[in-house]
Regions:
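Short glycine-centered segments of the SAM/dcSAM-binding site in methyltransferase folds
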Residues: 78, 135, 159, 225-226, ...
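C-terminal hydrophobic helical "lid"/dimerization subdomain
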Residues: 265-316
Length: 316
């Protein structure tokens, strides 16, 4: 079968289109003929060797796939699934506990871009204990998790503020119906948030950029505000000032989806709710770009440029 391999850590150029044996079946796993593959920033971190607990070269990257199960508990069904790695391939072994038949309302490309983004967004909002009419600010709002979080928060009655890095993405967010859109390139973007929020602060911030934005987050949160950190796209984890946390009784939560996947029961309950939203078309993954598997390096370059929106998909 055709795969993408990482034989040494490095930039997108280390992604090699090559041949590999089809995986042998194992108990508790289903072999899936892959129709579409979700590209995540975690894939880039694995490629560079910066993903916590990530694989050593040589390996096949890729965390989520959609396709037809040819063996396992879901044999014959179209499923989406999460794998430890190995998704950038024509066939993938998917744990039965992390494979979910998907409704006809989703295309294969949308299914491949569903699990990581929507589960991350779901757990982030659950950790934040989002309530109707609360003010939610999403950093990197045009990305996969950002768009998923906005769709879910809209169902929960939140007032949503989105931060994005370019005029083009800001316009796209406005056209998608986001209530408040602010460009992070604007020197006074914090003032813009304060103005649009009525000056009384933000209840919840979903943070995936890291670095200097952490200090801005703490300035924007109102007393008893909640900061949910699920990434550091800037490459700089940043620092939190305890004095700022104490001053306004702020709380900080960290979210790493991989750790939450250790509870299949919790994931199954979350997916029941998310898939019902999908059936009712209350949530729909936004596909920003589709590349052939052989062009995985170009997909990584686009993702790392931060010029993309929604989800990037590979097709075997």
């Amino acid at each position: 079968m055709k795969v993408i391999t990482v034989e040494s850590y490095g930039g997108p150029e280390v992604l090699k289109y090559s041949e590999a044996p089809t995986p042998a079946t194992e108990p508790g796993f289903g072999l899936v003929k892959v129709e579409a593959i979700g590209v995540n920033f975690a894939d880039c971190m694995m490629r560079t060797g910066h993903y916590p607990g990530g694989p050593q070269p040589a390996f096949v990257p890729g965390l989520e796939v959609a396709g037809i199960a040819v063996s396992g508990a879901h044999q014959g069904k179209r499923i989406m699934g999460i794998v430890e790695h190995g998704g950038y391939a024509e066939y993938a072994l998917v744990p039965d506990a992390l494979a979910f038949p998907y409704p006809t309302e989703l295309s294969a490309e949308q299914a491949a871009g569903f699990l990581v983004t929507y589960l991350t967004a779901y757990y982030a909002l659950w950790m934040a204990d989002l309530k109707p009419d609360e003010k939610l600010l999403i950093q990197a709002a045009a990305g996969g998790v950002g768009t998923a979080a906005a769709q879910l928060a809209r169902q929960m009655g939140a007032e949503i503020f989105g931060i994005t890095s370019s005029p083009e993405k800001a316009e796209w967010l406005r056209q998608s119906g986001l209530e408040h859109v602010i460009e992070s390139s604007d020197y006074n973007y914090r003032e813009a948030v304060r103005e649009q929020s009525g000056g009384d602060g933000i209840d919840i911030i979903l943070e995936s950029v890291g670095g200097a934005t952490l200090a801005a987050d703490l300035e924007l949160l109102r007393p008893l505000g909640r900061l949910i950190v699920y990434g550091a796209l800037s490459g700089d984890p940043g620092h939190l000032h305890l004095g700022q946390l104490f001053a306004n009784s702020l709380s900080v939560h960290a979210l790493h989806l991989r750790s939450l996947l250790q509870s299949p029961e919790s994931v199954s309950m979350a997916m029941d709710e998310l898939l019902e939203y999908a059936r009712r078309k209350k949530v729909q993954p936004v596909i920003g770009a589709v590349y052939p598997l052989a062009e995985a390096a170009e997909a990584h370059r686009l993702l790392e440029s931060r010029a993309s929106y929604g989800k990037i998909i590979l097709k075997p």
